[in-house]
């Protein structure tokens, strides 16, 4: 069936509601928009769905959500998981409550119990809840930090981590089999509740989650001692972090927490920001304004589903607030945990630090200094959860901390996804420790540079929308894969890791060895002088990402080298 035939069916079929038909009929004559909405089925990737909200097969709407859920239901039934049930959470985005309800009722119509949160909750609490309730799976409706027009649908398995092999491929296969809406089941909410299939969860789960967060604190006595002296500014960016972040800080004893009022309440339109991303300086404009008014020590922002944390801290020498990348804040927390656990005798002899292949190489130096294993995984926090499961099954390592450059980390194993709530808590504890020692967070970061090396990382993202964009991204990857360079700028290419082919090719001797990681469309260039760069298309957005890493003799030298490497790599890639 052509895209136009599918469009006409959606406009006329009684299965679709009148608002959907009205939205689509208004597009008559706009063939480009119709084609974009119907040229494909919104792809259910290895993590789930993500797309623009709207009518059409290539959009996030109740019909595509039901279709994906039917595929998930079929797989759960094949695994005899109906009675274990599925936990469901959602964020503050437009249509998130509706999509979560549609998912629950589709599962209920298939005889599967659901445990849906009564109102919005952070993604990591969903991960925790899957484990706590003994569910077979979990669903969270979120598009993380994407622009307001997006929403998404992420699937978790019974260990509380996002789906990984074999479940991801098996669920994908089941979703692909649902080719017609006549295959999709649903039921009335009142009937589902009466049948004991639809359950609502809330405060009791919040309390259990909060207790697990507080267990990760290493020195609550330092927090209490510095509670009156440290000033924290926080913004949830209109998302789910507001209540849990404030609660954990209050229960630990922090007294001076200032919340950005304009961004305090949940709002899927994100009226104060164009892009609710704590990686973006613009997202901090209101928070930094408040920080200057109250003379804050630390400024924090969580994204809409509260799994990523952005940070600014004051440099007392200049009086300016300095932005911390995810690598920087992650290293501060990691080094603090390792140092303090070693000091109090709780650092396990078989401890492991986990990071992604595009996260700072400073982690390697810190892990070596504290005698813990450094394990690298592909991008995506599902691989962190998978590693924790491997550790437990094999009794090999004990997870201590995990971080990724994209502003996510996890302390503890109560959840199996990145958690901005625990990241806020731990970073504020680090700040309290710094304050008790007469230094700032920025001073502590400088100390890490001086001790382990002046590591610097960067990221460039190209957005290429539509069919043409997807083809351009594929063409770029093919060219780089098939014609690897011997040099990138002044750097020699020592080795090329191609994770799609599972090969690491030594560019001098020609030796080929396996990468040891799952298949993924990622190219990683090992360069001379401890530099590196990596290229990967996004799995959820029409983007291709370029990552860079260098180490210099001081901060200025590393910044200079990073700029040179960035320019050289983008030139090579044909930017």
Language model region names:
Residues 33-38, 42, 151-285, 291:
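Gly/Ser/Thr-enriched, mixed-charge loops and adjacent short helices
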Residues 292, 296-298, 320-322, 340-536, ...:
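Phosphate-binding and adjacent anionic-ligand microenvironments
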Residues 156-186, 327-350, 355-364, 420:
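Glycine-rich phosphate-binding loop plus the immediately following alpha-helix
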Residues 5-103, 192-228, 240:
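An N-terminal, well-structured beta->alpha segment
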Residues 38-58, 143-146, 232, 236-248, ...:
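Conserved phosphate/anionic-ligand binding catalytic regions in large, soluble enzymes, centered on
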Residues 99-107, 150-157, 307-327, 363:
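Short Gly/Thr/Asp-enriched flexible loops that form oxyanion-binding sites at enzyme active sites
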Residues 85-91, 231-234, 410, 549:
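Short glycine-rich or small-residue beta-strand-to-loop segments that form or flank ligand, phosphate
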Residues 87-150, 250-310:
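N-terminal small/polar loop signature for handling phosphorylated ligands or for N-terminal nucleophile
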């Amino acid at each position: 069936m052509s895209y136009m035939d599918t469009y006409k069916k959606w406009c006329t079929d009684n299965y679709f509601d009148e608002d959907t038909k009205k939205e689509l009929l208004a597009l008559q004559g706009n063939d480009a928009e119709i084609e974009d909405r119907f040229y494909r089925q919104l792809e259910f990737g290895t993590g789930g769905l993500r797309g623009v909200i709207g009518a059409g097969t290539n959009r996030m709407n109740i019909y595509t959500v039901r279709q994906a859920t039917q595929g998930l239901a079929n797989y759960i039934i094949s695994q005899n998981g109906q009675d274990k049930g599925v936990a469901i959470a959602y964020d503050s985005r437009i249509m998130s409550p509706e999509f979560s309800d549609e998912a629950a009722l589709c599962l209920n119509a298939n005889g599967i119990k659901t445990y849906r949160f009564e109102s919005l909750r952070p993604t990591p609490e969903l991960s925790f809840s899957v484990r706590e309730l003994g569910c077979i799976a979990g669903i969270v409706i979120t598009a993380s930090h994407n622009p307001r027009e997006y929403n998404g649908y992420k699937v978790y398995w019974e260990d509380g981590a996002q789906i990984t092999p074999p479940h991801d491929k098996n669920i994908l296969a089941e979703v692909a089999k649902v080719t017609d809406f006549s295959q999709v089941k649903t039921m009335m909410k009142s009937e589902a509740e009466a049948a004991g299939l639809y359950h609502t969860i809330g405060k009791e789960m919040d309390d259990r989650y909060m207790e697990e967060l507080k267990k990760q604190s290493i020195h609550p006595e330092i927090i209490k001692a510095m509670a009156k002296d440290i000033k924290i500014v926080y913004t949830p960016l209109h998302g789910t972090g507001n209540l849990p972040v404030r609660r954990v800080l209050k229960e630990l004893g922090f007294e001076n927490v200032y919340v950005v009022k304009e961004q305090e309440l949940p709002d899927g339109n994100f009226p104060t920001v164009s892009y609710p991303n704590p990686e973006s300086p613009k997202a901090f404009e209101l928070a930094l304004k408040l920080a200057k008014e109250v003379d804050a020590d630390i400024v924090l922002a969580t994204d809409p589903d509260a799994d990523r944390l952005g940070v600014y801290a004051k440099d007392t020498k200049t009086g300016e607030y300095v932005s911390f990348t995810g690598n920087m804040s992650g290293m501060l927390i990691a080094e603090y945990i390792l140092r303090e656990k070693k000091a109090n005798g709780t650092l396990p002899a078989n401890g492991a630090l986990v990071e992604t292949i595009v996260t700072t190489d400073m982690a390697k130096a810190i892990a070596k200094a504290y005698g813990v294993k450094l394990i690298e995984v592909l991008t995506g926090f599902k691989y962190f959860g998978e590693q924790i499961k491997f550790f437990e099954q094999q009794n090999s390592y004990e997870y201590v901390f995990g971080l990724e450059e994209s502003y996510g980390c996890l302390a503890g194993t109560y959840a199996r996804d990145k958690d901005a709530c625990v990241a806020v808590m731990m970073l504020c504890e680090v700040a309290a420790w710094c304050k008790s020692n007469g230094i700032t967070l920025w001073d502590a970061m400088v100390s890490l540079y001086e001790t382990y090396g002046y590591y610097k990382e960067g990221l460039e993202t190209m957005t290429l929308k539509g069919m043409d964009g997807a083809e351009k991204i594929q063409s770029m990857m093919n060219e780089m894969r098939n014609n690897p360079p011997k040099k990138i700028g002044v750097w020699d290419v020592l080795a090329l890791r191609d994770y799609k082919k599972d090969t690491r090719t030594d560019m001098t001797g020609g030796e080929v060895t396996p990468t040891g990681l799952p298949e993924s469309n990622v190219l990683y260039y090992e360069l001379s002088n401890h530099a590196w760069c990596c290229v990967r298309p996004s799995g959820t957005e029409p983007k291709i990402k370029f990552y860079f890493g260098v180490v210099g003799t001081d901060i200025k030298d590393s910044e200079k080298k990073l700029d040179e490497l960035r320019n050289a790599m983008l030139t090579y890639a044909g930017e």
